[in-house]
A protein has these predicted regions:
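Extracellular glycan-recognition modules
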Residues: 98-212
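Fungal secretory targeting signals
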Residues: 1-20
Length: 212
């Protein structure tokens, strides 16, 4: 579903934390989040569940990272402790909306195979995008060439020209003119089914194809 540097990925995220999270605000206006991804913070004021999972290189074990408190910033100290003396990657980015639209490392598709085993993309480093929210350290998702995450069985997302909104917080210094970085609603197949079908946020300076 997305494949550069996302400080916070999701339908919306902001630096200052308030009692109502971004997805609470949208829900109150009749537009509830159907996919809410963030490795830096909870997107609902009462959310205390899984934000993302990290995988440790030394022994391939995993750990789920949650907010420090409900509605709060991610528990980066837990990640730092777990990854001490080795490196970690982000293996899953959890959907906070309750619809189960979690993101895992993207498989290869018609546009080409990824560099990892089985043609999959590489996962993002769990420490390559440190940020601070309200004075607390968290980690965003740094996407470089050959990295990406996807869900080909999303539930509740818009189809065709159905109404939808998409939001992301991005690092404005990390982009290029190639194909492609985007986050949003894509086809449910990684292979070419004919004309491309995707409504997404594209972040880059290429204007050969649809952009905005």
């Amino acid at each position: 579903m997305f494949s550069q540097y996302l400080v916070t990925v999701g339908l919306l995220a902001v630096g200052s934390l308030v009692a109502a999270g971004p997805c609470d605000i949208y829900s109150s206006a009749g537009s509830p989040c159907v996919a809410a991804h963030s490795t830096t913070r909870a997107l609902y004021g009462n959310y205390s569940g899984s934000l993302y999972q990290v995988k440790r290189a030394s022994d391939s074990t995993t750990q789920i990272i949650t907010p420090l408190i409900a509605g709060g910033v991610a528990n980066s100290p837990a990640q730092d402790t777990f990854c001490t003396g080795t490196t970690c990657t982000i293996s899953i980015i959890y959907d906070q909306s309750g619809k189960g639209n979690h993101l895992t490392v993207a498989p290869g598709g018609s546009a080409g195979k990824g560099p990892a085993a089985g043609g999959y993309d590489n996962p993002s480093s769990a420490t390559a995008a440190p940020v601070y929210l309200g004075g607390k350290k968290a980690y965003g998702v740094y996407i470089a060439s050959g990295m990406g995450y996807r869900n080909n069985a999303a539930v509740g997302t818009a189809k065709g020209d159905g109404a939808q909104g998409m939001y992301a917080i991005l690092d404005g210094t990390h982009y290029n003119g190639g194909c492609c970085f985007d986050y949003g609603n894509a086809e449910t197949s990684s292979t070419d089914t004919g004309a491309g079908h995707m409504e997404a946020i594209y972040f880059g300076n290429c204007n050969v194809w649809g952009s905005g």
